[in-house]
From Swiss-Prot:
Residues 206-215 have a biased composition (Polar residues). This is Zinc transporter ZIP6. Residues 96-116, 133-147, 155-167, 227-237 have a biased composition (Basic and acidic residues). Zinc-influx transporter which plays a role in zinc homeostasis and in the induction of epithelial-to-mesenchymal transition (EMT). When associated with SLC39A10, the heterodimer formed by SLC39A10 and SLC39A6 mediates cellular zinc uptake to trigger cells to undergo epithelial- to-mesenchymal transition (EMT). The SLC39A10-SLC39A6 heterodimer also controls NCAM1 phosphorylation and its integration into focal adhesion complexes during EMT. Zinc influx inactivates GSK3B, enabling unphosphorylated SNAI1 in the nucleus to down-regulate adherence genes such as CDH1, causing loss of cell adherence. GO terms for molecular function: monoatomic cation:bicarbonate symporter activity; zinc ion transmembrane transporter activity. It is found in: Cell membrane; Cell projection, Lamellipodium membrane; Membrane raft; Apical cell membrane. Cleaved on the N-terminus before locating to the plasma membrane. N-glycosylated. Residues 452-474 form a coiled coil. Glycans are attached at residues 67, 229, 254, 271, 672. Belongs to the ZIP transporter (TC 2.A.5) family. One of its GO terms (biological process) is T cell receptor signaling pathway. It is a multi-pass membrane protein. Its main location: membrane.
């Protein structure tokens, strides 16, 4: 009996010695510092799980680290590749949204959290969810393994290995809250992700602002502090979760925030053990979609709206003010309207307006009106997305957004290329035809001079013959007949100079240099830019070819029936007969409505972002410059003083401010209405550019003014290409244009 008792005591002593040695051996393993479970637990091969985790860590460090350490830059690249480096805005269709999410989680065997095809179950199954993320919370107070709520498989072994190592991350600053709220659409969003304030969940000697050095002793001390806090924390919420710590309902942790939230310095390279502490937070961000914003959620849209609203008011007011001051610029440029330099300037400005208007329509407004290039994923292959799950969307969201955006930009640029190609073809053909016509006229001119000389000689010869006949038949004619016959040649001779003078005038009209010198200044003064045509009489063939800057000053071709000096006086009388009051109301209402539409477009564009408002403002500025100059010239022609003209232009500009305010309110408070405003504005811009301005660029008579047609051609091409280039640069780099306003 005594022998049996001694054997039992020896075995008991041996077991008591073996267990501490086994725990010390497990603690020496680089990935675990505490062994709380046997090698086989609930059918899980713990050693295999640890080995597999070590393999995956080695793969990550091989790709992103150097010398068995991971730098902050490498960590940022890792976050970028898995798609959680910054906030992205996506749109998920409700028909397959829940099924896709459910299938993704079912692939990972999270059956306990997704049983009803809805993310509302996150709130109901929060206990299981938190146990999966923090499996060691009840390990000291309960003998039950919290992993039992999960499914079976290899994924569960990863949770088992993570369970033992979460205890090592004793810094209570590893706070990445995943509190979900139920929304009407059936989707969930991250409510709070914030490092808690020191003193609430942290030990008194631990602060997130000054993370301590990561050593084994400090980890042990923080472990004791964590267990102390764990004993007083709520069992349902867990020590790692905090509510109402941030006013912002969404936060995407970047590399620096993840490191500081875990009590790690951003300048210290990470080893495998330290990186192991960050893995639950990284997986948590992917699972919580904290770096994604669903456009179907109204709450998710609030932060960007608040930011863009400030930009919209400030940027829109500045843009409208600058454009409205163009009317004052007309006061300076009116004295220059009779000079050749002004013609070249207007030609360049009109071409620039065509380039910016069409470029803004094709490269910015139309792509933004579809709202697909930076707001959503592609829905062309929903079946593939459901099969691969939302994780596939997370990994490829950035590439999809950039490729889709630039795809729309290149397609718009291709459309502009087709427009520019047809402009070149028609313009070159017109120049060739005009060159041939001029050559023919130069060939016909000597022939007409020869005809005049021949007619002069014939008239002299006929007069001599008639005189000789008079002398021969003098005796046979009566006195009255002789008087009548003698008057015939004199009458013929008297009529001949009139005929010759008329022919000379006709020939001179073919190249009326002096007349044109008188007509051109009047024509430039009498035409003004507007978007409607008058019904006054049209000019003859000479005036038909004289479409000087019809795109700028084109609705007052007032009675240009012949290029004489009195036509200027007649046109001025017509303007005065219309009445100053009538013309003023026409400018205020017509230009006011036009300015209102411009302000509406600018306001809606600024609610979309700074780059969007900038591109639209540039386009409006370029086409309003010749517009305002033309309106100012017409008001002065009607007999107004400079002060009155400035006043009426200012009144019409006030409607632009009203349009801007309307566009901001619509774009900010009405969902998706700004996209329709973009589409409408694109149509207006295309009409003004292609219908009003391009035809007059093609049908100018620069050579009749002593100017080179090819000079105008190259100047117009330079203006159009410059406008295209400005809009293209804004379109490509608009996501990098950032301007913050802090009040």
């Amino acid at each position: 009996m005594a022998r049996k008792l001694s054997v039992i005591l020896i075995l008991t002593f041996a077991l008591s010695v073996t267990n501490p040695l086994h725990e010390l051996k497990a603690a020496a393993f680089p990935q675990t510092t505490e062994k709380i479970s046997p090698n086989w637990e609930s059918g899980i091969n713990v050693d295999l799980a640890i080995t597999t985790r070590q393999y995956h860590l080695q793969q990550l460090f091989y790709r992103y680290g150097e010398n068995n350490s991971l730098s902050v830059e490498g960590f940022r690249k890792l976050l970028q590749n898995i798609g959680i480096d910054k906030i992205k805005r996506i749109h998920i269709h409700h028909d397959h949204e829940h099924h896709s999410d459910h299938e993704h989680h079912s692939d990972h065997e999270h059956h306990s959290d997704h049983e009803h095809h809805s993310h509302r179950n996150h709130a109901a199954s929060g206990k299981n969810k938190r146990k999966a993320l923090c499996p060691d919370h009840d390990s000291d107070s309960s003998g039950k393994d919290p992993r039992n709520s999960q499914g079976k498989g290899a994924h569960r072994s990863e949770h088992a290995s993570g369970r033992r190592n979460v205890k090592d991350s004793v810094s209570a600053s590893e706070v990445t809250s995943t509190v979900y709220n139920t929304v009407s659409e059936g989707t969930h969003f991250l409510e709070t992700i914030e490092t808690p304030r020191p003193g609430k969940l942290f030990p008194k000697d631990v602060s997130s602002s000054t993370p301590p050095s990561v050593t084994e002793k400090s980890r042990g001390s923080r472990l004791a502090g964590r267990k102390t806090n764990e004993s007083v924390s709520e069992p349902r919420k867990g020590f790692m979760y905090s509510r109402n710590t941030n006013e912002n309902p969404q936060e995407c942790f970047n590399a620096s925030k993840l490191l500081t939230s875990h009590g790690m310095g951003i300048q210290v390279p990470l080893n495998a053990t330290e990186f192991n502490y960050l893995c639950p937070a990284i997986i948590n961000q992917i699972d919580a979609r904290s770096c994604l914003i669903h456009t179907s959620e109204k709450k998710a849209e609030i932060p960007p709206k608040t930011y863009s609203l400030q930009i919209a008011w400030v940027g829109g007011f500045i843009a409208i003010s600058i454009i409205s001051f163009l009317s004052l610029l007309g006061v300076i440029l009116v004295p220059l309207m009779n000079r050749v330099f002004f013609k070249f300037l207007l030609s360049f400005l009109v071409a620039l307006a065509v380039g910016t208007l069409s470029g803004d329509a094709f490269l910015h407004l139309l792509p933004h009106s579809h709202a697909s290039h930076h707001h959503s994923h592609s829905h062309e292959e929903p079946a593939m997305e459901m099969k691969r799950g939302p994780l596939f969307s997370h990994l490829s969201s950035q590439n999809i957004e950039e490729s889709a955006y630039f795809d729309s930009t290149w397609k718009g640029l291709t459309a502009l290329g087709g427009l520019y190609f047809m402009f070149l073809v028609e313009h070159v053909l017109t120049l060739i035809k005009q060159f041939k016509d001029k050559k023919k006229k130069n060939q016909k001119k000597p022939e007409n001079d020869d005809d005049v000389e021949i007619k002069k000689q014939l008239s002299k010869y006929e007069s001599q013959l008639s005189t000789n006949e008079e002398k021969v038949d003098t005796d046979d004619r009566t006195e009255g007949y002789l008087r009548a016959d003698s008057q015939e040649p004199s009458h013929f001779d008297s009529q001949q100079p009139a005929i010759l003078e008329e022919e000379e005038v006709m020939i001179a009209h073919a190249h009326p240099q002096e007349v044109y010198n008188e007509y051109v200044p009047r024509g430039c003064k009498n035409k003004c830019h507007s978007h409607f045509h008058d019904t006054l009489g049209q000019s003859d063939d000479l005036i038909h070819h004289h479409h000087d800057y019809h795109h700028i000053l084109h609705h007052h071709h007032h009675q240009n029936h012949h290029p004489h000096s009195h036509s200027q006086r007649y046109s001025r009388e017509e303007l005065k007969d219309a009445g100053i009051a009538t013309l003023a109301w026409m400018v205020i209402m017509g230009d006011g409505l036009h300015n209102f539409s411009d302000g509406l477009a600018i306001g809606a564009a600024f609610t979309e972002g700074l780059s969007s408002g900038l591109s639209t403002s540039v386009a409006v500025f370029c086409h309003e410059l010749p517009h305002e100059l033309g309106d100012f010239a017409v008001l002065l022609k009607a007999g107004m003083t400079v002060k009155q003209a400035v006043l009426y232009n200012a009144l019409s500009a006030m409607l632009a401010y009203l349009g801007m305010a309307t566009g901001i309110f619509i774009g900010h408070y009405a969902e998706n209405v700004s996209m329709w405003i973009f589409a409408l504005t694109a149509g207006l811009f295309m009409y003004v550019a292609l219908v009003d301005m391009v035809p007059e660029m093609l049908h100018n008579d620069a050579s009749d003014h002593g100017c080179s047609r090819w000079g105008y051609f190259f100047l117009q091409n330079a203006g159009m290409l410059l406008g295209f280039g400005i809009m293209l640069l804004i379109s490509i780099f608009e996501h990098k244009i950032v301007f913050r306003i802090n009040f």
